[in-house]
Amino acid sequence: MTVKLLTDHDLPFSELVPGMELARSITNAGTTQLGGGYMKFTEDAEFPDWTLKYDEVLFVQSGELEIVSDGRSVKANEGQAILIPDGAKVTYRGRAGTVGFFVLWPFDWNKET
């Protein structure tokens, strides 16, 4: 494995929900167990009621990201990050213009065992 610069240039973004797009830049082709990529909000949006099957760190490059879990809201602004543990049930919320980077472990969380 070699050291690699990660950018969102030329990555295909796909819509997760209206207003929220993801582009994967860390895949099993480039690392052993990490997954990750970029997220951007083209409008105010939320992705509700997701139960994580992995540990995740979300870093906010610009804008504001909010995670709601167990009735508690955690907001991160530019330069801040949020840690979400495996098993947490969350709602992701972002404002239009928010851009972030996410890293998760393990990358193959949805693999059949």
What is each PLM-predicted segment?
Residues 71-86:
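Short acidic-glycine-tyrosine-enriched beta hairpin
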Residues 57, 64-66, 73, 89, ...:
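Structural motif
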Residues 1-38:
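A short, N-terminal "cap"/entry segment at the start of jelly-roll beta-barrel domains
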Residues 61-62, 78, 96:
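A cytosolic small-molecule/anion-sensing beta-strand core signal
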Residues 30, 68-72, 95:
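Short strand-coil-strand connectors
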Residues 40, 51-67:
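Short, conserved beta-strand element in jelly-roll/cupin
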Residues 35-52, 86:
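Conserved short histidine dyad/triad with adjacent acidic residue
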Residues 86-110:
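Ligand-binding loop in jelly-roll beta-barrel domains
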